[in-house]
Every structure is written in C-alpha cells, then in structure tokens.
UniProtKB/Swiss-Prot annotation:
Species this protein is from: Chlorobium phaeovibrioides (strain DSM 265 / 1930) (Prosthecochloris vibrioformis (strain DSM 265))
Alphabetically ordered keywords of this record: Cytoplasm, Initiation factor, Protein biosynthesis
Role noted for this protein: IF-3 binds to the 30S ribosomal subunit and shifts the equilibrium between 70S ribosomes and their 50S and 30S subunits in favor of the free subunits, thus enhancing the availability of 30S subunits on which protein synthesis initiation begins.
Cellular localisation: Cytoplasm
Biological process annotations from GO: ribosome disassembly
Protein name (database record): Translation initiation factor IF-3
GO terms under cellular component: cytosol; membrane
Subunit: Monomer.
Gene (UniProt): infC
Length: 209
C-alpha cells in the first residue's frame, strides 16, 4: 500500500490519505473538537465535498482517527515547524554572569538587568556565584542570592533545577519563558520602561549551549 511520508524532527511520520484508508470505519475529529464515528466511504465523500483530504492521524486507535485537512498544507506546516525548531536550537546561547555572596545592591541590579535582557532575547542564562578564599563557609549567603535571582528573573524565565555547588562555585540556570516575556514586554512598552541597558560588565562570559 502506497503511503505519504514525511520526516519530522524526532521520528518518521507516515500518513494514509483518502483511498489509502481501507478500514471500514473511522473516527473523525472535526475542527471544533467534536468527534463522530462513521463509515470510511462516507468520510471520503465528506472530504470531497469539503474539497480537502481525509487524513489518518492515529492509525492504531480503534477505530483509526482521521481528520479533514489539506495534506500539502499539513506537511508544509510540519516542515516549517521542524525548520524553526532547528534554527532555534542552533541559535540558542548560554549567557553567563558572575556574582559573589556579598554582591552589593548596585552590582546585583546591574547584572540581573542584563540577565533579564538575555532571557528576553531567548537565551539560557547561568548565574555563577563565586566563593573567594574562605567565603565558601558562607554557603547560605550564596543560596539566598540564588533565591533573589530566581525571584527577580521570574518575570521573564524559570529556574532550571536547583542551584548546584561545584567546588567553590554555585551555578544557577534559567530558561526563557515566552509567555512571561510577551506579557512583560507589553507592560514595559505600555509604561515606557524600555530604557537601554548600560554596557555589559567586562567579566561577562558567553558559551555556546
């Protein structure tokens, strides 16, 4: 049996369409979310009347699940989605800024403003809290700073896991959250708070993820 094939990012997806669907009945999922089990021949007739294709999307269901859609447009959307995903994966960068347990308010505000901006641009960020000399005995201060960072950056991102100690460094990772970023940008635009950031600190680091 001839099948229409398309390769997605993770797996090969094979669709049966129109006359390729040989089962006696199918479950149709309509665009409004309603469902109906009907004879396959009737479903094909409906597809023709709608000038669209009958596409089997869940062949292992009982009965198989189909929908009415334009196969060419569906495959194009999937190819475009995979292309966008690949592009996003290639351009995602890990941005890093360093702090100390006793980082003062000015330095904290300055650096977290940059971390916010990195997240707004879709980058992952890492805040590295460095314990110099014997300051490692003040781990609690480092963890408190990590919580302050988490609260400050929660408007545009989410913390990725718990803070992790490695030697005399405490690493805190954050992921951008598109919904939060969109909402945050709307508020900033409305209130006119889109002032340019100062130059980045010299100790900034940048690594490819």
């Amino acid at each position: 049996m001839k099948k229409q094939k398309v390769t997605s990012q993770k797996q090969k997806i094979t669709y049966r369409v129109n006359e390729q669907i040989r089962v006696p009945e199918v479950r149709i999922i309509f665009q409004d979310g309603t469902q109906k089990v009907m004879q396959t021949a009737e479903a094909r007739r409906m597809a023709e009347e709608r000038n669209t294709d009958l596409i089997e999307v869940q062949p292992n269901a009982e009965p198989p699940v189909c929908k009415f859609d334009n196969l060419g447009k569906l495959l194009f959307k999937m190819a475009q989605r995979d292309k966008d995903l690949k592009k996003k994966q290639k351009t995602t960068t890990l941005k890093e800024l360093r702090f100390h347990p006793n980082t003062d308010k000015h330095d904290f505000d300055f650096k977290t403003a940059h971390l916010e901006e990195f997240l707004r641009k879709g980058n992952r960020v890492r805040a590295t809290i460095v314990f110099l000399g014997r300051s490692i005995i003040y781990k609690d201060k480092g963890l408190e700073l990590a919580e302050r960072l988490t609260e400050r950056l929660s408007v545009v991102g989410n913390r990725d896991g718990d803070p992790k100690f490695e030697g005399k460094k405490l690493f805190v990772y954050f992921e951008p959250d598109k919904k939060k970023i969109d909402a945050y940008d709307r508020i900033r635009t409305k209130t006119g708070k889109l002032a340019p950031l100062p130059d980045e600190p010299e100790e900034d680091g940048e690594n490819n993820d």
